[in-house]
């Protein structure tokens, strides 16, 4: 691997293409309010307040772009972009990547807009892993017993010491991403790490804070209201 990349740039793709269908809402989930502000704004603020120089690209459905321009304008810098996404998460990620002029040493982070509780020190640790290992993701452990089922019946129990729940951001170094982009896929990957694994590239894990949930359903939004004050506390304690 190359030595430390002192001239690297950091790019952040925030995928904001949710429709709100699983939420049972006509309003896309990224626009639903959490403590008086859209969820998207909470997620955007996590990166704007990070303290690192970075370029942010927001990716969304065409019909949502005017709304994003309206609510996010004051949080975006001159080089930040809002771009139209694709038909699914992977194609939307590719749309965001297509506007980046990244180099081999650069770091690209991909984050779900519906995850508003990521910590700055986690972002630092993730970037360190990406520098050294090429691909990395935030993930969390479980204290629960994990089982596998088939047709509603228990089949086996998994060793929870080796079970992690995938989170975002996920990150990739520019040289590794360039290689991935040369391959064609037979099926649609669910995220950056599954895309990489399709071609034999494993991802390193950085442990995430326990509040880093993805707001997908109404009960998630209810939890997020509770988590918000806890998140502010752990953010200030670090």
From Swiss-Prot:
Descriptive protein name: 2-C-methyl-D-erythritol 4-phosphate cytidylyltransferase
Signal peptide region: none
Keywords: Isoprene biosynthesis, Nucleotidyltransferase, Transferase
Pathway named in the protein's UniProt entry: Isoprenoid biosynthesis; isopentenyl diphosphate biosynthesis via DXP pathway; isopentenyl diphosphate from 1-deoxy-D-xylulose 5-phosphate: step 2/6
Positions MEP for the nucleophilic attack, annotated site positions: 160, 214
Record-linked SUPFAM superfamilies: Nucleotide-diphospho-sugar transferases (SSF53448)
Site feature Transition state stabilizer, where: 22, 29
EC number from the UniProt entry: 2.7.7.60
Family the UniProt entry places it in: Belongs to the IspD/TarI cytidylyltransferase family. IspD subfamily.
Family annotation (HAMAP family): IspD
Keyword Lipoprotein carried by entry: no
InterPro entries for this protein: IspD, IspD/TarI, ISPD_synthase_CS, Nucleotide-diphossugar_trans
GO molecular function annotation: 2-C-methyl-D-erythritol 4-phosphate cytidylyltransferase activity; cytidylyltransferase activity
Keyword Transferase: yes
Example of a GO biological process term: isopentenyl diphosphate biosynthetic process, methylerythritol 4-phosphate pathway
Catalyses which reaction(s): 2-C-methyl-D-erythritol 4-phosphate + CTP + H(+) = 4-CDP-2-C-methyl-D-erythritol + diphosphate
GO CC annotation, single: cytosol
Pfam families: IspD
Function, in words: Catalyzes the formation of 4-diphosphocytidyl-2-C-methyl-D-erythritol from CTP and 2-C-methyl-D-erythritol 4-phosphate (MEP).
Gene3D superfamilies per record: Spore Coat Polysaccharide Biosynthesis Protein SpsA, Chain A
Domain of life: Bacteria
């Amino acid at each position: 691997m190359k030595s430390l990349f002192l001239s690297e740039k950091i790019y952040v793709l925030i995928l904001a293409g949710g429709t709100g269908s699983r939420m049972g809402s006509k309003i896309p989930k990224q626009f639903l309010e959490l403590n008086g502000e859209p969820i998207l704004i909470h997620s955007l603020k996590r990166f704007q307040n990070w303290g690192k120089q970075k370029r942010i690209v927001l990716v969304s459905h065409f019909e949502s772009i005017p709304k994003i321009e309206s609510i996010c304008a004051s949080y975006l810098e001159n080089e930040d972009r809002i771009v139209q996404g694709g038909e699914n998460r992977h194609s939307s990620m590719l749309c965001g990547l297509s506007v980046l002029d990244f180099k081999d040493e650069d770091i690209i982070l991909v984050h779900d807009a519906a995850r508003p509780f990521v910590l700055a020190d986690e972002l630092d640790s993730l970037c360190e892993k990406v520098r050294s290992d090429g691909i990395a993701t935030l993930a969390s452990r479980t204290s629960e017993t994990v089982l596998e089922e088939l047709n509603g019946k228990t089949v086996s129990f998994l060793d929870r010491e080796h079970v992690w729940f995938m989170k975002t951001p996920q990150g990739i170094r520019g040289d590794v991403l360039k290689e991935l982009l040369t391959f064609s896929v037979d099926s649609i990957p669910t995220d950056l790490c599954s895309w990489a694994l399709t071609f034999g590239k494993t991802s390193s894990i950085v442990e995430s804070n326990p509040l880093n949930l993805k707001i997908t359903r109404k009960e998630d939004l209810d939890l997020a209201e509770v988590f918000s004050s806890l998140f502010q506390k752990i953010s200030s304690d670090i």
